[in-house]
């Protein structure tokens, strides 16, 4: 790709990998990634950098900014519960051209002020590790993503505000480990419909002997579950799943 400088942009318009919205009180924001990277960052205040650094600092005056990350290669976000930086993130948009690699463990963990997460469906098709990826985030509607290679979702939505989760998300995955869903939705806010969607999809998957955590927080109590959710729970139980939820076990 040939990069042409036009105004504050080195890359041509439209090929952004990730756009972050942040709110900065006046001070430093560190853009965090992991692994080998080579990217351009438009800081949203007229400054542009090209970098191969995993922790790249930038100093702002107080305000709201849109940061745009461009990369032709693998670029793996990794805020990993570093509160000073993760808590500044208010939104994430990931375009269809992004290459997130295979490991998104802790990518946006601790982004407690992230109220919007938008991601192209196929961007996650090669990701295997989603441990703690959206832990403690604040957006309520989870997008439809391709989890066909994923093998672990341990703590993926732990303590998040996720309420609405799409159907069929786990129909096809990689070979799940026995702890693949341990603590995954503890202290979240899943609706009864979302729990139905999750359980039915996991039952469709066919995996056996796995621990699943959908308890705590305001996750819907079994007293509000649908017949389809109850049936899926019972089917998973018969397949050796160890499921913890709010309310008594379905019968």
Please give the residue ranges for each predicted region.
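Short acidic/polar inter-strand loop motif in beta-rich domains
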Residues: 72-80
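Short acidic/polar micro-motifs centered on Gly/Asp/Asn
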Residues: 32-63
């Amino acid at each position: 790709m040939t990069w042409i400088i036009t105004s504050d942009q080195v890359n041509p318009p439209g090929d952004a990998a990730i756009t972050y919205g942040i709110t900065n009180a006046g001070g430093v924001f560190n853009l965090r990634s992991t692994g080998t990277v080579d990217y351009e960052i438009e800081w949203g205040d007229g400054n542009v950098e090209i970098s191969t650094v995993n922790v790249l600092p930038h100093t702002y005056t107080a305000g709201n900014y849109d940061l745009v990350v461009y990369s032709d290669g693998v670029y793996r976000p990794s805020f990993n519960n570093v509160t000073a930086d993760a808590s500044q993130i208010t939104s994430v948009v990931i375009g269809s051209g992004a290459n997130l690699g295979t490991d998104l463990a802790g990518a946006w963990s601790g982004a407690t002020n992230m109220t919007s997460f938008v991601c192209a469906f196929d961007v996650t098709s090669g990701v295997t590790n989603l441990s703690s990826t959206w832990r403690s985030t604040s957006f309520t509607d989870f997008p439809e993503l391709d989890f066909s290679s994923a093998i672990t979702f341990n703590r993926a939505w732990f303590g998040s505000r996720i309420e609405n989760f799409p159907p069929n998300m786990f129909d096809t995955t990689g070979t799940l480990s026995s702890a693949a869903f341990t603590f995954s939705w503890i202290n979240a806010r899943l609706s009864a419909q979302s729990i139905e969607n999750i359980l039915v999809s996991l039952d469709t998957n066919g995996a056996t002997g796995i621990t699943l955590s959908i308890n705590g927080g305001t996750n819907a109590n079994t007293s509000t579950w649908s017949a389809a959710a109850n049936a899926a729970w019972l089917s998973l139980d018969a397949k050796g799943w160890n499921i913890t939820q709010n309310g008594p076990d379905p019968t």
